[in-house]
Amino acid sequence: MLKLIKCEFLKLKRKPLVFISLLLSVFMPLAYAFFLADVNTDVDAVNGVMSSLFQLSAYLLLMPLLVILASNLLFEELDNDTLKNLVTVPVNRTKLVLSKMLVLLLFAVGFMAVGGLVNLAVLLFQGWEPVGFWNLFGVGIEEGLIMWVGALPCILLVVLLNKNYIVSVVITFFYTIANSILSTNDMFLTQPFGLNIGTLFPGPLAFRWTFQFYDQSQTSVELADLLERVSPYFLNGVQVFGVIIVEAIVFLALIAFVYRRQEI
């Protein structure tokens, strides 16, 4: 399995998309840097740049990038007509597809880590003290895991549609926008923990996890009002990671099952 993961990483060297994607991870932090002039405190500066990473980069960039990269990884052997040779070796197709999914997981973590470090550089360059930054940096790494799990349904769709890239990308686009909207809608942010959209979809799930870690010692009236409405519905680590572990097991099993049954 480790050898397969290493091979998948070596393939990434030939994919400009990977490096372009990592460059995109710095786009939101750099764009938000222009708004730091209106910030009054170090805490607000850190909260602001990290919220741009959590609520913009993760939702609007990372999830679709994971699906696009997955479509490249999953069908590379078919496009180059090498899957037959791999099966003859033999290479277990379940292990092959799972190694690709693990590479995507590492990419998601790397994406959030790079974005977080760029945020730190922006803060230091503009003279802000990174108060509470490292705590939020760790939360960002964990959100990368949540976004990876959130992308698995779309990756399953990519495998089911079997190289129909356009349809997959269109559906992923709407799924991404839907998650972004759900993460800002009180109707879904104030649902109790259970089998509902506010718990099972990555957008509201990630918001109800990450928002509680912002430094709330100095809050505006609007933020205080939002906290009053949403804080009773914050989720703890056991709840959040319990959900994503179950979802990951289910969708990885389905992806592996469909991938194994595809014709070579």
PLM region spans:
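Terminal transmembrane helical anchor/hairpin motif
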Residues: 39-49, 169, 173, 177-258
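Hydrophobic/aromatic residues in alpha-helical transmembrane segments
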Residues: 66-70, 79, 83, 118, ...
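Short cytosolic juxtamembrane segments of multi-pass membrane proteins
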Residues: 260-264
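Aromatic- and glycine-rich beta-strand/loop motifs that create alpha-glucan
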Residues: 1-22
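Secretory targeting signals
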Residues: 26-68, 98-165, 230-237, 241
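Helix-loop-helix units of permease transmembrane domains in multi-pass membrane transporters
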Residues: 72-105
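Residue-level recognition of transmembrane alpha-helices
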Residues: 21-25, 100-101, 169-173, 244
